[in-house]
Amino acid sequence: MDHAADAHRTDLMTITRFVLNEQSKYPESRGDFTILLSHIVLGCKFVCSAVNKAGLAKLIGLAGETNIQGEEQKKLDVLSNDVFVNALVSSGRTSVLVSEEDEEATFVEPSKRGKYCVVFDPLDGSSNIDCGVSIGTIFGIYTLDHTDEPTTADVLKPGNEMVAAGYCMYGSSCMLVLSTGTGVHGFTLDPSLGEFILTHPDIKIPNKGNIYSVNEGNAQNWDGPTTKYVEKCKFPKDGSPAKSLRYVGSMVADVHRTLLYGGIFLYPADKKSPNGKLRVLYEVFPMSFLMEQAGGQAFTGKKRALDLVPEKIHERSPIFLGSYDDVEEIKALYAEEEKKN
């Protein structure tokens, strides 16, 4: 009997243990972040359970309301939003919440306030629920740097000021990918234990990938650099093999694959959406934060994505993120275009 292997299997690094270990590196820490994260983790477990039984519990149908983005809300969207708002408020560690589903920011009542602001998309890719495609929750965390009354300005900060970001993907397995600014780590939910276990320590994206991920249905509306780049992916002139196209249409699934296998995810501006489609605070920033922490890059077509300073909580931006070398290529095409102009 292999006792060493058995011991290894029973010495599980749960997400709570992992975050506590990180916390111990900072003697001045009071554990507020650990408590906040435990509430986010609970929200993810709740939503994972709801997603898994959505068809059976009739949570799939439209709720008959339209959210701030003009998208009809599904019941599961509404439920997920309620779960995360309640989990974050009850943690006693937040002051401002921004959700994709709510038109205005939520300001926590004074007695329950803490030093963090959380921006999140409670259920990204929810149009894919009916067909069982992977969907997910995306979140980013800022620190409140004053004790005055919180305002929207507390979250309208560049992404480089985030202290943590992550996503939870509800697919063939439930996986939570997290960065607190010291690398990227992946935790998989063990359903028998009800715990997220560290399965992907220190994720590093390959420097170059052979996959590109974009909605080619919008190709006729793209600008020059995006058109040239995708053409180059499909018909390389330097003798290298063509890249493969992989596009799910659920940002969490597409970015997750890009993070693990390498390549590039593109959601460019086009004639229909001149400012891009993805929201800066709770889609572009968290995913860009994770990509950079894993050794990749994130670019808006004009600048480093994390250097953007949003002016509105639901502001949108184009985004190109993924392997370092692949993003370098599209940056070069935009630089070329700028020289011409």
Swiss-Prot record:
UniProt subcellular location: Cytoplasm; Nucleus
Null mutant phenotype: Slight decreased in growth rate.
Cofactor: Mg(2+)
Binding site for substrate: D124, G125, S126, S127, N215, Y247, Y267, K277
One GO MF term: metal ion binding
Pfam families: FBPase, FBPase_C
UniProt binding sites for Mg(2+) 3: D121, D124, E283
Presence of keyword Transferase: no
Keyword entries, A-Z: Carbohydrate metabolism, Cytoplasm, Hydrolase, Magnesium, Metal-binding, Nucleus
GO cellular component terms, semicolon-separated: cytoplasm; cytosol; nucleus
Keyword RNA-binding recorded: no
Miscellaneous note of the record: In plants there are two FBPase isozymes: one in the cytosol and the other in the chloroplast.
Family (UniProt): Belongs to the FBPase class 1 family.
Protein name: Fructose-1,6-bisphosphatase, cytosolic
Organism whose genome encodes this protein: Arabidopsis thaliana
Gene responsible for this protein: CYFBP
